[in-house]
């Protein structure tokens, strides 16, 4: 039987609750699909600051580098917001991405038919939406130098090199080849020099993928078009800052940020996480939606472990659970036949994934 080592980072807030449900689903499905998972827990975020004095202990980095993949919950909270930047939970995640040489973030947005009323947009606008945002993750303005403060002035620098743009472009075009073969590259080339280089480089790389249709869009127009006509998009390729914004905007097409997973890939180990935050205001209440984390576990099986059939089983179990009317509190107003706790939702999906609930 195949064996895989998974690094587990539960993090802060609802992180431990939702990661436990993802593990429950993975455990329910692994044996029947011929593989075994072993988990190793590590600290990151606010809990790491409290226990180890830093947001990312060296032990966590080393453990993640040894693992076949990393499954992560969420970090952060008001408790740590006043700390110096280098001690805030978010700095730990940025450092981990850099340590793992991760450079590409994949964020799918799929509108489930069963939850179409959850969106604030009309059914005619969002029905059938299936978008993948490919975001460059370790370059751009979040990491560019120089940055800092001088008296009453503060500054950051947006920097991209040709190799950085080339490698993220390849990720987007390869993803498009498995989808509808359309890439929309989003930049601000009418204002920013760095975006002009981005557009030139992406256009050149596109020639290596003649089957893929490439279009370009300015970030302000893209933000508007994502609401006006989201079905025009297949794969959206963009930089770190713009991708951070667009992926959160796209998430609301589905009606709940608690539904959507993400994968951060390209380096020594891949990191899988829900796109929502740590939601400390509902932590410990048993009402958090675990679907995004369970879907992230499915992406882990698919992209890092090659267990495609198991991933398909989880995805189908999520759809079946929603079709049967099971809902957590955040989506309870839309077709709910039964309101579930976090634990109950995880158990239902686990049962369907293992074919116990058929």
Curated annotation (Swiss-Prot):
The record marks 142, 188 as: Important for catalysis. Binds 1 Mg(2+) or Mn(2+) ion per subunit. Mg(2+) binds at residues 220, 244, 248. One of its GO terms (cellular component) is cytosol. GO terms for biological process: L-leucine biosynthetic process. Signal peptide: none annotated. Pathway: Amino-acid biosynthesis; L-leucine biosynthesis; L-leucine from 3-methyl-2-oxobutanoate: step 3/4. Pfam families: Iso_dh. Its cofactor is Mg(2+); Mn(2+). NAD(+) binds at residues 77-90, 277-289. Keywords: Amino-acid biosynthesis, Branched-chain amino acid biosynthesis, Cytoplasm, Leucine biosynthesis, Magnesium, Manganese, Metal-binding, NAD, Oxidoreductase. PROSITE patterns: IDH_IMDH. It catalyses: (2R,3S)-3-isopropylmalate + NAD(+) = 4-methyl-2-oxopentanoate + CO2 + NADH. The keyword Oxidoreductase applies. Its EC number is 1.1.1.85. It comes from the Bacteria. Substrate binds at residues 97, 107, 135, 220. One of its GO terms (molecular function) is 3-isopropylmalate dehydrogenase activity. The keyword Iron-sulfur does not apply. It is found in: Cytoplasm. Catalyzes the oxidation of 3-carboxy-2-hydroxy-4-methylpentanoate (3-isopropylmalate) to 3-carboxy-4-methyl-2-oxopentanoate. The product decarboxylates to 4-methyl-2 oxopentanoate. Homodimer. Belongs to the isocitrate and isopropylmalate dehydrogenases family. LeuB type 1 subfamily. PANTHER family: 3-ISOPROPYLMALATE DEHYDROGENASE (PTHR42979:SF1). This is 3-isopropylmalate dehydrogenase. It comes from Wolinella succinogenes (strain ATCC 29543 / DSM 1740 / CCUG 13145 / JCM 31913 / LMG 7466 / NCTC 11488 / FDC 602W). The gene is leuB.
């Amino acid at each position: 039987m195949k064996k895989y080592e998974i690094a587990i980072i539960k993090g802060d807030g609802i992180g431990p609750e939702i990661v436990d449900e993802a593990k429950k689903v993975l455990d329910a499905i692994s044996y029947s699909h011929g593989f075994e998972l072993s988990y190793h827990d590590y600290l990151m975020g606010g809990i790491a600051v409290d226990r180890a004095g830093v947001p990312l202990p060296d032990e966590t980095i080393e453990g993640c580098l040894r693992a076949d993949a990393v499954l992560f919950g969420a970090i952060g909270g008001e408790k740590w917001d006043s700390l110096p930047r280098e001690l805030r939970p978010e700095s730990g995640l940025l450092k981990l991405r850099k340590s793992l040489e991760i450079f590409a973030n994949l964020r799918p947005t799929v509108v489930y038919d069963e939850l179409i009323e959850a969106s604030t947009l009309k059914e005619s606008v969002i029905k059938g939406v299936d978008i993948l945002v490919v975001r460059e993750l370790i370059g751009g303005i979040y990491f560019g130098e120089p940055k800092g403060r001088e008296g009453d002035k503060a500054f950051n620098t947006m920097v991209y090199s040709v190799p950085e743009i080339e490698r993220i472009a390849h990720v987007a075009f390869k993803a498009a080849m498995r989808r509808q073969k359309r890439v929309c590259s989003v930049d601000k080339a009418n204002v920013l020099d760095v975006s002009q280089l981005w557009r030139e480089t992406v256009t050149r790389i596109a020639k290596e993928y003649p089957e893929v249709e490439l279009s370009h869009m300015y970030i302000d127009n893209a933000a508007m078009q994502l609401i006006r006509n989201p079905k025009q998009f297949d794969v959206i390729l963009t930089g770190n800052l713009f991708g951070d914004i667009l992926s959160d905007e796209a998430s609301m097409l589905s009606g709940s940020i608690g539904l959507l997973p993400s994968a951060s890939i390209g380096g020594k180990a891949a990191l899988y996480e829900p796109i929502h935050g740590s939601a400390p205001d509902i932590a410990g209440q048993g009402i958090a939606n675990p679907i995004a984390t369970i879907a992230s576990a499915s992406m882990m099986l698919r992209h890092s472990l090659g267990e495609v059939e198991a991933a398909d089983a989880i995805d189908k179990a999520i759809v079946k659970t929603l079709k049967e009317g099971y809902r957590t509190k955040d989506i309870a107003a839309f077709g709910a036949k039964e309101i579930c706790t976090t634990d109950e939702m995880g158990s239902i999906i686990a049962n369907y994934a293992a074919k116990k609930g058929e």
